[in-house]
Regions:
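Short, ordered loop/turn segments at secondary-structure junctions
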Residues: 21-23, 54, 78-79, 86, ...
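Conserved active-site and cofactor/substrate-binding residues in soluble primary-metabolism enzymes
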Residues: 35, 44, 83, 106, ...
């Protein structure tokens, strides 16, 4: 894998530091661990910082400081990108460095780069997709195996798909952060999660599942963003009826899917 990375990057990639407050005396990388972020920040040899802490504090301070110091940043921190992305992108642009956050949306589906580059000459009209694998797995178990929500959630936790505290997933918070990131990129207006109507799947019952099946469809948690005629952007996250003919109907288990509707501009 090292040779493959070297070929793609064009230069050798070396991990010089690992920031962690804990001690790892038995780790083969023990010489790389540091507890003071300033060691990384003040080292002129460091050109890229990878943030994997999560949340806003202290991630925001570390990422902002890195960008201001002329270091590119890579992150999968969806909360950080959703709430502070516009500011951090502005700093990165001013400093001539990169702020990469492809992994923050869609479980690694390559959606951010296509929106930013491949579809940049088109007008994005709507995004409506399955953005959270945990809730999609739970709904799949409720549909296929006739499970109640609590039983499906327990199964997801046992398999490692859901956290011990699953609120961010089942309450739609994770999907909300992701659709805000996509909407901000697509429509050029920063969309804040606190302003978005967000409803999770905790109230879905087996009766709801059966009702949808009777009408030839199923329930999916959908993140939706659309450009309105007046120029405003409408965004929401909620369970939705998906007809069996829809592409999204066949997306099950922990998988994500993000259809994008656009207008080709001449």
């Amino acid at each position: 894998n090292k040779e493959g990375l070297l070929k793609k990057a064009g230069q050798e990639i070396e991990i010089k530091y690992i920031l962690d407050l804990r001690d790892f005396p038995d780790s083969p990388y023990k010489d790389k661990f540091v507890k003071d972020f300033n060691v990384i920040l003040n080292d002129p040899e460091i050109s890229v910082v990878v943030e994997v802490i999560g949340g806003i504090k202290p991630s925001y301070d570390f990422v902002k400081s890195s960008l201001l110091a002329g270091k590119s940043v890579v992150t999968s921190n969806k909360e950080l990108v959703a709430k502070k992305g516009a500011e951090l992108l502005k700093i990165a642009h001013e400093k001539g460095v990169n702020f990469f956050f492809e992994a923050s949306v869609g479980g690694g589906i390559p959606i951010i780069r296509p929106l930013h580059q491949c579809l940049s000459a088109n007008r994005i009209d709507e995004i409506a997709g399955i953005l959270n694998g945990t809730t999609n797995f739970i709904l799949t178990k409720m549909i296929r195996d006739n499970m109640a929500f609590d039983d499906a959630l327990k199964t997801a936790q046992e398999l490692g798909y859901a956290e011990r505290n699953p609120s961010a997933d089942v309450d739609g918070i994770d999907a909300c952060r992701k659709i805000c990131i996509l909407a901000s990129l697509s429509f050029g207006k920063h969309v804040y999660p606190d302003n978005i109507h967000t409803e999770g799947i905790t109230k879905i019952t087996p009766e709801d599942v059966a009702y949808c099946e009777n009408f030839g469809g199923s329930i999916k948690l959908i993140g939706w963003a659309s450009r309105q005629d007046d120029g405003k952007v409408a965004v929401m996250v909620c369970p939705a009826f998906i007809h069996e003919d829809s592409q999204l109907a066949g997306v099950n288990d922990v998988f994500n899917a993000i259809p994008v509707s656009y207008t080709h501009l001449r």
